[in-house]
Amino acid sequence: MRSYFEKPRSTVGWKGLINDPYLDDSFKISEGLKIARKLLLEISEIGLPLATEALDPITPQYLQDLISWSAIGARTTESQTHREMASGLSCAIGFKNGTDGSLEVAINAMQSAVAPHRFLGINPSGQVSIIHTRGNPDVHVVLRGGSNGPNYEKEAVLKSEQQLQGKGLDPSIMIDCSHANSNKDHKNQSKVLDNISEQIREGNESITGVMIESNIGPGNQSISDKLEYGISITDACVGWDLSLIHI
């Protein structure tokens, strides 16, 4: 289950449950971490693996033992800090292509993350330490489209396979049905998923997963004093009924 607690922003805005859990600019981060961990534990107890976005390099020491898969977002895939962090995370990592649609930054990130690194970080006791990582072999690319348009269709997937193989990387591809692939319209996620399903029926073996932005109710809402339960306050999502059909 996609359980994102940190929100990267193009400029400013609500940065997620960990950063501001009460949506009131009180920024009670210590409480946000506890709430996030409690939710992860509850979801784990019903047997669902958990996926999140690795954004703040400190956060994984508090949550990583409950995470099965992490994304490195389009804005941070090019960041050395996030590549180093990914090299030491104990889960599979999906690197998104750049916001311009380029796959090169994700490929470079994958090559970096599979290698060992040394960098400053915190240890499990919260002390500043020199971190030594072994490299993470479980990395792959996430196609999310870009400023030049979507990249989920057959031709784009084939090109991605060729680029990955050309660099000696496993052509394991996850496709993000949202963001630029949906033209930022949550209703288009069904169209994207239909196209992906057809590619798999035709014999594609490189597509190993999809990402769907879903919530209890469809759409989204602005942060206010009167929030409707189960409706996203960030990106627009498909509702739960449609999510079940997608699955």
Which residue stretches match the model-derived regions?
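Redox- and metal-dependent alpha/beta enzyme cores, enriched for Fe-S-associated oxidoreductases
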Residues: 160-167
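Short helix-terminating capping/connector loops at secondary-structure junctions
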Residues: 167-170, 204-206
